[in-house]
C-alpha cells in the first residue's frame, strides 16, 4: 500500500501513488476518494510540487486519466 501524502489545497486532502502500477489515489476534502490508472511518476511529482495542487489536478489529471 502506498503512503498517503497530505496536500495543501482547498479541494484536495491527500494522495497516494504506486510507482509500480501508476495508480494514483486522490482524496478530496469532501471525503470521496478517486483512483486514476497509468499515471506517470512525473505527473504525481508535479502534483506534490505544485503551488496549487487543485489547479494542477484540474489541468493535468482530471479528464486525462481514468
PLM feature segments, named:
Residues 2-66:
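Acidic/histidine-enriched, beta-strand-rich ligand/metal-binding domains
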